[in-house]
């Protein structure tokens, strides 16, 4: 017999749990289905740990608005829950005149987005702040922080259950179908009918959204982000987060140096096509995923437009020397012996039919279904703000007990 639940959520990552938390604390019965044995097992637990201040994003975009709102909510939440938060600050370093011009645009965006304390640095200012960093100019974002996102996800989950919500682990969703004015969700535990379904499934979102009646686009193409970890003897050389000026043609921030909340420091990530939806290693290969890519017009167009960049990223993946060469342009002291391999992550990158990478957050609403179709960085920072948006857009009739 079908079980009636008012609101269902697929995915126990940061956005799914933040949404469940807000619903449960508002008195709305909610159930979260998660295919893994623990929360935050994929993107939410495999990111760089950076709490972004909002300097990069197009003013007025969903990223800009949700990042600024999200960082304030998250800072207060971590303080209230006693979760670690380290406001290290970030330097975005320009290495030549072209990058300096791009950096001026980032400065303009940071001002338009209301990011506090951002200031311009010339070469001597950089060296005074970070003697081991090379650059001709930089932006300092003093409120950029690092945090423990897996711990934040666990805290969200504890809030959900404390408020009466349910989180069902080891519960992969095998089918989603519209049913009258609601949705049926099929798991190993049975068939569950919900008044509203929120899909926050990251790397699997496009497949589940289509099953629930959403359009094909955008498609998810998985990109693996690989990291190298600084050895203990050189971690002290840099205090701030150090980022290059991003190439505006790509929604990636480039290989950067990030101190982590546990005292480690990582260099990365690159952006390499993953051969499986959860392809954390080169040997993780899914014939089904490769078949999907081969049939995808969007992917073929993406590959055709960006094959040179793709080859460069693949070269950096198989050659540590090539990986380090990019970082040496602003960390000239870096040597191969200073780093070791670190765990990789996989980014769920949405791609439109014309082959363009979707940059902004994208959330679709299809009747009783909300599908988070694109939530790259800074989605972890913005998780509580995105949850606010999702819950606000649900009608009262969807939230009946």
Summary of predicted features, one role per range:
Residues 297, 302-401:
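C-terminal catalytic lobe of FAD-dependent flavoproteins
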Residues 59-69, 93-102, 140-159, 168, ...:
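Short beta-strand to alpha-helix junction loop
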Residues 49-125, 135, 254-255, 264-266, ...:
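Dinucleotide-binding Rossmann-like beta1-alpha1 core, especially the glycine-rich loop
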Residues 5-32:
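N-terminal Rossmann-like FAD-binding beta1-loop-alpha1 element of flavoenzymes
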Residues 139-196, 207, 384-393:
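Helical element adjacent to the flavin cofactor pocket in flavoenzyme catalytic cores
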Residues 15, 38, 204:
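Conserved Rossmann-like nucleotide-cofactor binding loop
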Residues 18, 176-285:
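Flavin-dependent oxidoreductases
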């Amino acid at each position: 017999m079908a079980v009636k639940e008012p609101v269902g959520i697929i995915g126990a990552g940061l956005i799914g749990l933040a949404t469940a938390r807000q619903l449960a604390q508002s008195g709305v019965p909610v159930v979260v289905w998660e295919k893994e044995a623990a929360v935050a097992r994929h993107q939410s637990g495999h990111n760089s740990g950076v709490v972004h201040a909002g300097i990069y994003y197009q003013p007025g975009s969903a990223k800009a608005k949700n990042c600024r709102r999200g960082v304030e909510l998250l800072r207060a939440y971590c303080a209230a829950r006693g979760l670690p938060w380290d406001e290290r600050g970030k330097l975005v370093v320009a290495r030549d005149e072209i990058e300096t011009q791009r950096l001026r645009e980032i400065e303009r965006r940071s001002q338009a987005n209301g990011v506090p304390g951002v200031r311009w640095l010339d070469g001597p200012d950089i060296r005074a702040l970070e003697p081991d960093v090379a650059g001709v100019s930089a932006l300092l974002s003093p409120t950029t922080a690092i945090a423990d996102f897996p711990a934040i996800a666990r805290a969200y989950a504890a809030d959900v259950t404390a408020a009466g919500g349910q989180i069902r682990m080891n519960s992969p969703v095998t089918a989603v179908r519209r049913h009258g004015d609601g949705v049926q969700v099929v798991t190993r535990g049975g068939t569950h009918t919900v008044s509203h379904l929120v899909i926050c499934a990251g790397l699997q979102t496009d497949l589940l959204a289509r099953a629930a009646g959403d359009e094909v686009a955008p498609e998810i193409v998985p990109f693996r982000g690989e990291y190298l970890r600084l050895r203990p003897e050189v971690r002290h050389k840099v205090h701030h987060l150090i980022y290059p000026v991003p190439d505006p043609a790509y929604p990636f921030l480039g290989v950067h140096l990030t101190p982590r909340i546990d005292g480690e420091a990582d260099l990365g990530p690159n952006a390499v096509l993953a051969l499986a939806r959860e392809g954390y290693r080169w040997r993780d290969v899914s014939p089904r995923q490769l078949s999907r890519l081969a049939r995808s017009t969007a992917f073929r167009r993406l590959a055709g437009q960006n094959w040179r960049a793709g080859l460069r990223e693949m070269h950096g993946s198989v050659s540590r020397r090539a990986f380090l060469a990019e970082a040496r342009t602003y960390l000239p002291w870096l040597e191969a012996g200073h780093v070791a391999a670190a765990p990789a992550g996989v980014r769920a990158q949405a791609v439109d039919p014309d082959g363009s990478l979707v940059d902004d957050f994208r959330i679709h609403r299809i009747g009783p279904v909300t599908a988070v179709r694109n939530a790259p960085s800074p989605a972890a920072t913005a998780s509580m703000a995105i949850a606010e948006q999702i819950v606000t857009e649900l009608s009262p009739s969807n939230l009946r007990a």
